[in-house]
Amino acid sequence: MAKVLVLYYSSWGHVEQMANAVAEGAREAGAEVAVKRVPELVPEEVARQFHYKLDQAAPIATVEELADYDAIIFGTPTRYGNMASQMKQFIDQTGGLWAKGALVGKVGSAFTSTASQHGGQETTLTSFHTVMFHHGMVVVGLPYSFAGQNGVEQVKGNSPYGATTIADGDGSRQPSQVELDGARFQGRHVAGIAAKLAG
């Protein structure tokens, strides 16, 4: 049984919803799944002023525990086409893991949210891919065998680089069914590959 970590940062809960959907998919594939988040860096009074979702149930991860999993699926909202600083700050502490080759051969994947359809989804996902390559991870996206990412009949996220959702500039749009389905598919897909690699 593959061990999968869904590690995310979420300001307003969109990525949290996607993380839970990713975890559902990985569990459906038979994986042992943990959902954890990285620490918030925004001062609490500022976070409250901007209505951040501060009641997220997922526990805070430690850098060292990343080595305990067969696959890590990262999630973050985009910040100007890149991962959020909270996630970057966490990842920047993985030098010790890199020095030991602790993540080499593990499966890595990512998902994100943006304010608009063209708000930097794919560049955010590829910012994770660069990190994964440096750690020697096996990078997995969201293949076109997930049919929900095809078509133009509705505004929707998802990309071959990973599952995505569109939140609108004020955060009013919640992840749609097809976006959550994409996240579940990605979780199943990653867990299946991790199980094969773990032997």
UniProtKB/Swiss-Prot annotation:
PROSITE patterns: FLAVODOXIN_LIKE (PS50902). Substrate binds at W98. The keyword Transit peptide does not apply. NAD(+) binds at W12. The keyword Nucleotide-binding applies. One of its GO terms (molecular function) is NAD binding. It catalyses: a quinone + NADH + H(+) = a quinol + NAD(+); a quinone + NADPH + H(+) = a quinol + NADP(+). Its cofactor is FMN. Belongs to the WrbA family. This is NAD(P)H dehydrogenase (quinone). It comes from Methylorubrum populi (strain ATCC BAA-705 / NCIMB 13946 / BJ001) (Methylobacterium populi).
